[in-house]
Amino acid sequence: MTQMLTWRDALAQEKTLPYFQETLAFVARERAAGMTVYPPAKDVFNAFRFTELNAVKVVILGQDPYHGPNQAHGLSFSVKPGVPAPPSLVNIYKELASDIPGFVIPNHGCLQSWAQQGVMLLNTVLTVEAGKAHSHASLGWETFTDKVIKVLNAQREGIVFLLWGSHAQKKGTIIDPKRHHVLKAPHPSPLSAHRGFLGCRHFSRANALLEQQGQQPIDWTPTLPAA
C-alpha cells in the first residue's frame, strides 16, 4: 500500500500556482494596509491543521468566514471560545439536540473537537474583510478549495460530505457519489433552516455510515480545547 499523502504533499504543487500566490499576496497587502481581515493569518489554514488528509471522515462545507470581531478561526461554522454561537450554529445545535440522544446544547460555539476527530470544517473561501460578507469571494480561494475537494474525492473513499445550501451543493458536484456518501439539506441559516435543515438528521446518518465502514462514530458534543 502506498504511503497516504498529507495535505502538505497533496497541495504542494497547487500552492506554487500563480493564482494561489496572487491570492495570498492580496490578503497580505490588505493586512499591511491596515484593513482587518478574518480569520487572523495564523488561523487561515486551521481546517487543514486540525484534520489531516488521511484522517478525514466527514466534510462540512461552509462558504466564507464569519466577518464579525473574534469569530472566525479557520473552521467552518465554528467560533472562538468565549464568543456566542452565531445563528446558523444555533440551528446546527438545535438539529443535534433533536437528532442525537443525550446531546446537550453547549454554552460555546467552538467546534475544534469535531475537527480533531476527523470532521473537516472547510469554508470554500478562506478569508474575508471585516464587516463585508463575500468580499474575498473572487480572489482565487474557490479554485483552491475545488482542488481540495478533488484531492479528497480521488485520494480517499467513504467520506461523508454534508452539503448544506445551494453553494455547498454546487461545489459538491465534484464528488463521486460511488466513492463517497453525499448528504444534502438546506442551509442552517435562519432564512432556510425550516425548509428542511431542521429534521435532516445528518449527524446520526453520518455516524451510521461511518459505523457501517467499521469506523468510530463522531462525538458530536463540542468540547473546548484545553487552555
Swiss-Prot record:
| Catalysed transformations (reactions) | Hydrolyzes single-stranded DNA or mismatched double-stranded DNA and polynucleotides, releasing free uracil
Residue spans making up a coiled coil are none
According to its UniProt entry, the protein's GO biological process terms are: base-excision repair, AP site formation via deaminated base removal
Using the UniProt record, give the first listed, main subcellular location.
cytoplasm
Query: What is the E.C. number?
Result: 3.2.2.27
Give this protein's Gene Ontology molecular function annotations.
uracil DNA N-glycosylase activity
Signal peptide (UniProt feature, chain positions): none
Name the UniProt key words of this record, in alphabetical order: Cytoplasm, DNA damage, DNA repair, Hydrolase
Q: Which family does it belong to?
A: Belongs to the uracil-DNA glycosylase (UDG) superfamily. UNG family.
Designated name of the protein: Uracil-DNA glycosylase
Q: What organism, scientifically named, is this protein from?
A: Sodalis glossinidius (strain morsitans)
What is this protein's gene name? ung
